[in-house]
Each structure stands twice: as structure tokens, then as C-alpha cells.
């Protein structure tokens, strides 16, 4: 096992695909500070790395046989994450304990499963039930130091894209590479009675009272192997210890709560004018743009709405530049809400974005409410 761990370290520390995937989905705060040298050269997207990365992810779900060459590394990751959790359970009393209940919304796989729409849904429903929720997040992709309070006026460059969606809730919301520090800041400055952590299932420095795992109902767990041979951050046995499993779009299995994600409205990025899905004001031949872990889900949604789309996929959390969406034709461009948040300053009048709303079966909120009441 020590040999596999040593080789895994080399694989992760190399400046390549697996380093990028690992840093995105496993690291919670930077361990070292690197000196950044500014350059006057024009920015050129690393499309080779992005393309190769998508090939690796696709291979996980196509169950490609070559991935078994990485099986020893997968065993090492599975061992490491299991040991990390066992250490947490053994020393949980020594970890930071929030004054109010903590709800973790996370997943077992690398890539997007719909955590942020679910966090928004849970927060909205808790407010309806009389709770005063707050939110903490890592703020992936944001450029900020220490703890940052996010409002609907905080620039996307500081917050990262996903935080922009949650900022519209107008509730206490803090981001920090160190989630525990964000928790402490929120508790010290606000009178919240429940806190939701967007992601953080594997962040065992943080105690938790409720664990919710979101799974992609279509792709599920791919080849069921741990990173880097597959998409799993932890063993599938981890599902036995969580409180709720929410299945994004189904089909569901026993014990899973179905979450449906529905299109809400189209919003023109420059003018802010909004239209219902039924009242789209232009022709339906469009460019569809998505920088998601699973862009196909967004493209399929537009196709079901009757659009004739040209697919333009980008990597998850892609930092868009104006050239990325500069198409020579005059077709409208439809993006996701989180991608559009990074294009507000572009001189492009063709960009629209589609807002979505998540909804989970009523029994889910009933059970969550009951569990929270039993904690008090």
C-alpha cells in the first residue's frame, strides 16, 4: 500500500489532468503559497488539458477497460479516504462543533450532480417553515482571502460561479477555503438557527448533524471505482451512513428522494428582461453553452424544450473570456445561470441564460424538518 500511495502522490503532484481533478474535488484549502508571475502575453485557453480531462471523465461512465490500469491508485485513495473518516469518527468530539445544526449537502462523485440547486431549494423551504438558515461554501474558483461574506453585489471574480446563484437568497452566506472558519464567522455574526454547507461531505474537520448526498440519477456512479480510476471520492458503502440520498432526475432506487430540476425563465444578460419558458421571444436555433461537470444534462434540457442547438461544452467552472462565446453567426446564445455570471462584462448582446428551479418530494422536507426538531 505504501508504494501505491507514493505513486499516487506523484500522479497528483504532476501538473496534469489528475492534479486538476484532485485539487477541484478533494483539497479544501491551499497547503502552500505559490509565487505568481504576471505575464503580458495574451491568454490562451488550455484546450488540450480541458479536452483530455473530459475524456477521462467520460471514460469513467463508459466503463472503459483501460482505467483498470489505475486500479492500484484507486485502492490507495479508497484506503486513504476511509482512514480519514475513521479518524474523524474517533476524534469527532475534538472537532469544531457549531452552536446550531449543520446540514452537509455533498456527493460521492467528482463532477456536478446538482448540489447547488438543492442547497437553494432547502434554504428556501426552511425559510417557509420558519427557520433562519445561513450558508457556507468553499467558494471554488473565487479569488478572495480568508473569509468573505457573499451578497448579490459581490463580484463573481471574488466568489466563483456557484456562489453567485446562492447569493440571490439574501441570507447570511460566507465562503472560505477553510469551511470551519466560515462557520465560526457566520455563528459569531448572525442569529441563524441552521447552517447549510454547500459541499463538504469529505471535509472531516467540520462536525455535522445531517448529511445529504446528491447523486446523478442518469450516470449514478459510473464504473464504481475510486479516483483516479473512477469518479468516486469515497466508497459506495459511505451511502449507508448518510441521512438522506437525493436523486437528481431519476430513476430512483429504494431509499432515494427524487429531485426534479425544471426550467424557470430565460433572462437576457445585458438588459435583464425575462421571459417564461413558453414565451421565448426569438427563433429556436441557438448556441447552447455550458461549463458544467455534466453539460449534456443542460443540452438535453434545451432539446426537450424544442430548441435546435449547437452544443458548445466547456469544463466545469470554466473561466470564460469573450472569445469563448464570439460566434460569427447571429444565433442567440443560451447559457447556464452560473456561466452567465462570468460573462456580465462581455460586449455581447446575444447572450441569454436559463434559470432553473429544483423541487424534491414533499416527504424529504418533512423528514428533514423532523430531524432538525429532534436535534434541538
Where are these regions (language model features)?
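A transmembrane-helix-recognition feature enriched in membrane-embedded lipid enzymes
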Residues: 47-101
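Short, flexible loop segments at boundaries between secondary-structure elements
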Residues: 315-319, 350-376
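Short, high-confidence coil segments that cap the C-terminus of an alpha-helix
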Residues: 131, 190-192, 208, 283, ...
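Residue-level signal for inorganic ion chemistry
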Residues: 76, 116, 166, 198, ...
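Phosphate/Mg2+-binding loops and adjacent switch elements
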Residues: 140-254, 267
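C-terminal accessory "lid"/substrate-recognition subdomains
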Residues: 42-60, 220-334
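C-terminal portion of ABC ATPase nucleotide-binding domains
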Residues: 1-43
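Walker A (P-loop) phosphate-binding motif
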Residues: 85-152
Amino acid at each position: 500500500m505504501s508504494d501505491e500511495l507514493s505513486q499516487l502522490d506523484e500522479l497528483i503532484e504532476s501538473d496534469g489532468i489528475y492534479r486538476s481533478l484532485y485539487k477541484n474535488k478533494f483539497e479544501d484549502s491551499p497547503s502552500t503559497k505559490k509565487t505568481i508571475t504576471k505575464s503580458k502575453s495574451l491568454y490562451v485557453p488550455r484546450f488540450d488539458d480541458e479536452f483530455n480531462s473530459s475524456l477521462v471523465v467520460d471514460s469513467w461512465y463508459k466503463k472503459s477497460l483501460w482505467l483498470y490500469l489505475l486500479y492500484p491508485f484507486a485502492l490507495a485513495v479508497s484506503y486513504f479516504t476511509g482512514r480519514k473518516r475513521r479518524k474523524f469518527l474517533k476524534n469527532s468530539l475534538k472537532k469544531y462543533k457549531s452552536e446550531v445544526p449543520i446540514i452537509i449537502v455533498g456527493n460521492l462523485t467528482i463532477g456536478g450532480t446538482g448540489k447547488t440547486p438543492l442547497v437553494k431549494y432547502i434554504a428556501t423551504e426552511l425559510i417557509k417553515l420558519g427557520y433562519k438558515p445561513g450558508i457556507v461554501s468553499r467558494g471554488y474558483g473565487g479569488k478572495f482571502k480568508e473569509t468573505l461574506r457573499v451578497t448579490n453585489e459581490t463580484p463573481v471574480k471574488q466568489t466563483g460561479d456557484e456562489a453567485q446563484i446562492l447569493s440571490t437568497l439574501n441570507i447570511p452566506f460566507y465562503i472560505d477555503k477553510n469551511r470551519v472558519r466560515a462557520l465560526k464567522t457566520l455563528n459569531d455574526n448572525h442569529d441563524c438557527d441552521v447552517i447549510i454547507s454547500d459541499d463538504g461531505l469529505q471535509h472531516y474537520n467540520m462536525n455535522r448533524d445531517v448529511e445529504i448526498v446528491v447523486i446523478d440519477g442518469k450516470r449514478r456512479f459510473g464504473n464504481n471505482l475510486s479516483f483516479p480510476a473512477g469518479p468516486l471520492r469515497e466508497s459506495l458503502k459511505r451511502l449507508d451512513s448518510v441521512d438522506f440520498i437525493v436523486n437528481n432526475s431519476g430513476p430512483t432506487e429504494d431509499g432515494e428522494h427524487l429531485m426534479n430540476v425544471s426550467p424557470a425563465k430565460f433572462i437576457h444578460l445585458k438588459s435583464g428582461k425575462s421571459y417564461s419558458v413558453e414565451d421565448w421571444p426569438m427563433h429556436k436555433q441557438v448556441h447552447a453553452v455550458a461549463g458544467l461537470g455534466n453539460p449534456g444534462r443542460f443540452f438535453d434540457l434545451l432539446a426537450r424544450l424544442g430548441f435546435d442547438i449547437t452544443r458548445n461544452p466547456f469544463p466545469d467552472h470554466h473561466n470564460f473570456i469573450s472569445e469563448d462565446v464570439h460566434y460569427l453567426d447571429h444565433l442567440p446564445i443560451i447559457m447556464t445561470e452560473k456561466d452567465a455570471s462570468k460573462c456580465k462584462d462581455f460586449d455581447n448582446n446575444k447572450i441569454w441564460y436559463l434559470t432553473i428551479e429544483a423541487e424534491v418530494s414533499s416527504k424529504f422536507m418533512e423528514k428533514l424538518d423532523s430531524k432538525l426538531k429532534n436535534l434541538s
